[in-house]
Amino acid sequence: MWPLVLVPVGLVLHDYLKAPIDRLYFQNPRRPLVGMRNTIIDIITGFSNYRVLDHPGLWLIKFHFRKIQKEFGKVSKKLEKQYFHDLDPWFEKNDNYYFYIAENFPLLKNLIDQIPCINKETALFAVVEGPMTIAPHRAETNLLLRYHLTIEGGGDCTLYTEKGPHVHKEGEEYLFDHARYHELTKTGQGRRVVLILDVHRCF
């Protein structure tokens, strides 16, 4: 009997103890349930290296990189900036960190609509101007992976994950589990623009 009781405890602890530890974890009564699911997904998938080609149609994003880049340069100038600190109070107020929703870019929206593994509701361009750091953090759920395609970047911005560093260089893509540790450091004065997509896992 006792071993059976310890199973859910072990599942929750596996998720809770991932770095960085979320001190507010148990303030949300649903979080331990999500944590058990996260651990089961970790067991099923292992500590995988995620490949774009394993997700149907996702390769089309980088294939159309130049068109996406050109559309961003043209359309973003006409749009109002939306700030991450308004979206989520976890972010400190920073007018140099903002985003544009992907649905305001017709070519990109049409492309995303053709790719079933992409979560259509969260697609956006994230912009960082000047030096900046984003502290270590992780998402609450690992049902989705995160995809980055660097639209603008001179190599002065690095995303650190458990897999090691990924430098945001123009035209390069990266797929990772954002429910595990990641942080960002940008040292230069230039602008970094990344297309961020949440991608459904392929089990």
Where are these regions (language model features)?
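Conserved metal-binding segment of the jelly-roll/cupin
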Residues: 167-181
